A protein has these predicted regions:
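Predominantly the C-terminal beta-signal and adjacent terminal strand-loop region
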Residues: 132-166
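Bacterial N-terminal signal peptides
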Residues: 8-16
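Sec/Tat signal peptide C-region and signal peptidase I cleavage site
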Residues: 18-24
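Residues that define the transmembrane beta-barrel architecture of outer-membrane proteins
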Residues: 28, 37-41, 64-68, 84, ...
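Bacterial N-terminal signal peptides that target proteins for export
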Residues: 1-9
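Outer-membrane beta-barrel domain signature
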Residues: 25, 30-32, 57-59, 110-116, ...
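Short glycine-rich beta-strand segments
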Residues: 35-39, 89-99, 143-147, 165
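Gram-negative (and chloroplast) outer-membrane scaffold detector with strong preference
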Residues: 47-140
Length: 166
């Protein structure tokens, strides 16, 4: 757990220092697609409110779990390449886990007899590539989240997203 936090913190610091003087240029206004690889797989929508700020919604699923996440994100050009953007942000999630589910987690194994509410805070740090000349964006990110209602529990979810942009 500590190793993941150190890796996330180091990546965030490198990203912040390398993009401090660069401004992002959104290559699309809205993107809709799929996300997978972490705790939940599901749907994602990202909408830019200006050239460097976006809001993202994620509807995630896994067996017995549904979760909705909202994120506020800042974007900045990565590696002086206009089609690549670093992004980071924060938000929150709410969801539910069905009763009768067994959860294995870092030595804190649990069985949920009843339906349970999930509420917590989220962060995100990633890299997005808007493929030039076609309406597709690919992103890879780390999505740390703090579960408050059933926790406290801190997890870091790596994931990839594929969005159709317009």
């Amino acid at each position: 757990m500590k190793k993941s936090i150190i890796i996330f913190g180091t990546a965030f610091l490198i990203m912040a220092l390398s993009t401090a003087k660069l401004s992002a240029q959104a290559n699309y206004k809205t993107g809709v697609g799929i996300r997978g690889g972490g705790y939940e797989n599901g749907l994602t929508i990202k909408h830019f409110t200006n050239s460097s700020t976006a809001i993202e919604g994620i509807l995630g699923f896994r067996p017995g779990v549904i979760i909705v996440t909202g994120l506020y994100e800042k974007h900045a050009v990565a590696f002086s390449e206009r089609s690549l953007n670093w992004y980071y942000g924060a938000g929150a999630h709410i969801g539910s886990i069905d009763g009768g589910r067994y959860y294995r987690g870092y030595g804190k194994d649990r069985f949920y007899d009843n339906d349970e509410l999930l509420i917590g805070f989220d962060g995100i740090l990633g890299l997005e590539w808007k493929i030039p000349e076609i309406p597709i964006a690919l992103s890879f990110d780390l999505h740390p989240r703090l579960e408050c209602a059933r926790g406290p529990y801190l997890g870091i979810e790596p994931a990839a997203s594929l969005r159709f942009t317009f």
